[in-house]
A protein has these predicted regions:
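Hydrophobic alpha-helical membrane-embedded or membrane-associated segments
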Residues: 11-19
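Soluble "head" domains of membrane/secretory-pathway proteins
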Residues: 1-5, 9, 21, 25-31, ...
């Protein structure tokens, strides 16, 4: 009777509390909009984001991240790849990214999308400040990234995307 109902309410309440805590502090999902991460991610892909990642360790080169952008009165979340880390000197000419003078190997780029002369705006030599990263989309000609936004503060990183979970045909670890 009443005891069973009370037990049921407690179980549901605890489950909701746990779900809210996980969503708020640990894990989020993100729906990819636009084509800036083609061909790694496609519009409509859904990814899980570890929101604790950068509370436990610093961002890493190559990490796929969700970042929070505020431009004037507009707020939105973007998904990009970390290319440059604090203290790095980054530059890009004719689609070739150099970090501290060394060519950055980027096996995740689709050579049919990023081709010499077709990679959007270049990057003049820039040193990345402390507690900031330089992000770019894998679809270089079609990405709104640090080339336009500037370097991104660590505090604007929502977390590290680590898996595409939907649609099933696109399932992959990032």
């Amino acid at each position: 009777g009443a005891r069973a109902f009370f037990d049921w309410v407690v179980v549901v309440g605890v489950a909701l509390l746990v779900a809210i805590l996980v969503r708020t502090f640990l894990l989020a999902h993100f729906i990819v909009e636009g084509e800036s991460m083609n061909s790694t991610l496609s519009p409509g892909d859904r990814v899980f984001v570890n929101k604790m990642s950068y509370h436990l360790h610093d961002p890493g080169r190559g990490d796929v991240v969700v970042l929070h952008e505020i431009t004037g009165v507009t707020e939105r979340d973007l998904i990009k790849r970390i290319i440059g880390l604090p203290g790095d000197e980054i530059q890009m000419d004719n689609c070739v990214v150099r970090i501290n003078g060394q060519v950055l190997l980027e096996p995740y780029l689709d050579p049919t999308v990023v081709t010499p002369g077709r990679c959007g705006q270049g990057i003049t030599p820039t040193v990345i400040p402390e507690d900031r990263v330089f992000v770019m989309g894998d679809n270089r000609p079609g990405s709104h990234d640090s080339r336009a936004l500037g370097t991104i503060p660590f505090d604007d990183l929502v977390g590290r995307a680590f898996v595409v979970f939907w649609p099933k045909s696109d399932w992959q670890w990032l």
